[in-house]
């Protein structure tokens, strides 16, 4: 399976390193639309959503990602990636990809200094607690029909799935746990 990490900004290397640990995965850093269109799955990493959103438009990557979604290719957005996927952003008038029926709040847990780690129990993902790293993290304020809430932290939605789309407010790539990767890759079957 050919799995790409959108390689324009953010935690690209960390996602690539995790994918390389999974047997049968060809990890690809996707920096152009031609590469994007060859993928069996795509991860949109954390970073700065406004900067990534601008790059998506300026380099024609947005249309390629929208085509992947039309083909029901699994797409996973972590942190900023989740913001980019959201149909609505509460504290920002921009709409980037708008492919997932969620409403998110950017920097919901505060600034960089308010970043934190915690452990979450997410039965759909793992029988064990999962470490979750939140860095200037968003959260999901509401979900539309057909969106499955996977995890909450202090009453706020921090992980969700809608068909082929997965979104996490936190950074699984910064932990040793591959559970979210394995779950994501099963969306392709």
Curated annotation (Swiss-Prot):
The reaction(s) this protein catalyses: aldehydo-D-ribose 5-phosphate + D-glyceraldehyde 3-phosphate + L-glutamine = pyridoxal 5'-phosphate + L-glutamate + phosphate + 3 H2O + H(+); L-glutamine + H2O = L-glutamate + NH4(+)
GO MF: glutaminase activity; pyridoxal 5'-phosphate synthase (glutamine hydrolysing) activity
A Gene Ontology term for the protein's cellular component: glutaminase complex
Keyword terms, alphabetized: Glutamine amidotransferase, Hydrolase, Lyase, Pyridoxal phosphate
InterPro entries in UniProt: Class_I_gatase-like, PdxT/SNO, PdxT/SNO_CS
Name of a matching Pfam family: SNO
One BP annotation, GO: glutamine catabolic process
SUPFAM superfamilies the UniProt entry points to: Class I glutamine amidotransferase-like
CDD domains according to UniProt: GATase1_PB
Active site, per annotation: 79, 171, 173
EC number: 4.3.3.6, 3.5.1.2
Residues where L-glutamine binds: 47-49, 106, 135-136
Pathway: Cofactor biosynthesis; pyridoxal 5'-phosphate biosynthesis
Superkingdom of origin organism: Bacteria
Family: Belongs to the glutaminase PdxT/SNO family.
Description of how the protein assembles with itself and partners: In the presence of PdxS, forms a dodecamer of heterodimers. Only shows activity in the heterodimer.
Role description: Catalyzes the hydrolysis of glutamine to glutamate and ammonia as part of the biosynthesis of pyridoxal 5'-phosphate. The resulting ammonia molecule is channeled to the active site of PdxS.
Descriptive protein name: Pyridoxal 5'-phosphate synthase subunit PdxT
């Amino acid at each position: 399976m050919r799995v790409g990490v959108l390689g324009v900004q953010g935690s690209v290397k960390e996602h690539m390193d995790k994918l390389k640990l999974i047997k049968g995965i060809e990890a690809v850093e996707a920096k152009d639309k031609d590469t994007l269109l060859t993928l069996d799955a795509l991860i949109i990493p954390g970073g700065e959503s406004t900067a990534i959103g601008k790059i998506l438009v300026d380099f024609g990557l947005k249309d390629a990602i929208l085509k992947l979604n039309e083909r029901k290719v699994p797409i996973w957005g972590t942190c900023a990636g989740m913001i980019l996927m959201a149909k609505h952003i509460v504290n920002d008038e921009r709409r980037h990809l708008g492919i997932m029926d969620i409403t998110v709040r950017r920097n919901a847990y505060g600034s960089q200094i308010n970043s934190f780690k915690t452990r979450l129990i997410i039965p759909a993902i793992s029988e064990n607690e999962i470490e979750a790293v939140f860095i200037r993290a968003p959260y999901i304020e509401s979900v539309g029909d057909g969106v499955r809430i996977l995890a909450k932290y202090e009453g706020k939605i921090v992980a969700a799935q809608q068909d082929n789309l997965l979104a996490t407010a936190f950074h699984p790539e910064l932990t040793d746990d591959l559970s979210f990767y394995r779950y994501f890759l099963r969306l392709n079957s």
